[in-house]
Amino acid sequence: MYKITVGISCYKQKRWLHRCLRSLVNQTIGKDKFEIILINDDPEERLEDVCNIFSDHLNIRLINNEKNLGLPSSLNKILQNSLGQYFVRIDSDDYVSRHFLYMLSTFLDMNSGPRIMNSEMNCQAVACDYFKVDNTGQLMSRHSAEKEFVACGIMFTYESLCDVGFYDEDYKMREGHEMIRRFKEKYKVYNLPLPLYKYRIHESNRTKDSEQVQSYDKKLKGDK
């Protein structure tokens, strides 16, 4: 068992994956406290070479999908194989502060669980502020996750995710928005006003497909 499972799904983003994993090497929480489950969702690409570089420094499990399943199905596969008390998703083209895992897990240690079940501070998930960075890693702008939601970088208690039912695989985009909406119907999500996550903006971001985004935004509104 681990305190944290870090879930990373990679599809045609190998060029960014080294930076993502490197940001997890020197976390201020011991490496024995967290595992990384990396899903390769591109059958035509191999990630073993990347994993081998970090295998002495990180507890990585690589799962190769036999066919492209899409992000929500891959995230659910990670959750089904998780051994962590907490779960956090990091996108393969993003990276995090060295204090990211410690700060978010410590907050949940102090503010979730049956011992404070009647407290207004009882949270089953915590997000943090983030920086947008360009494809070279240069800072562009700071954002509040509370005001400008992103689906990655949120740490959940595993039990609460089991309760709400993981990701809806019908949502090939906006899967995080759909899941967090269901999650907030039952549980609190707190936002730490600390920019611990780096959200990379580049030419192949999934959200660049505005027609797809708008289509699933309409689906979200229709499914209310």
Segments predicted by a language model, with ranges:
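Glycine-rich, basic loop-to-helix element that forms the pyrophosphate-binding segment
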Residues: 65-82
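Short aromatic/hydrophobic "clamp" motif used to bind/position activated sugar donors
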Residues: 87
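Catalytic core of nucleotide-sugar-dependent glycosyltransferases
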Residues: 199-202, 208-224
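Short, well-formed alpha-helical segments that are part of the catalytic scaffolds
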Residues: 13-26
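Acidic donor-binding loop at a coil-to-helix junction in glycosyltransferase catalytic cores
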Residues: 172-179
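Conserved donor NDP-sugar-binding/catalytic core segment of glycosyltransferases
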Residues: 99-139
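Catalytic beta-strand/loop signature of glycosyltransferases that borders the donor
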Residues: 129, 190-196
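Acidic donor-binding segment of Leloir-type glycosyltransferases
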Residues: 25-63
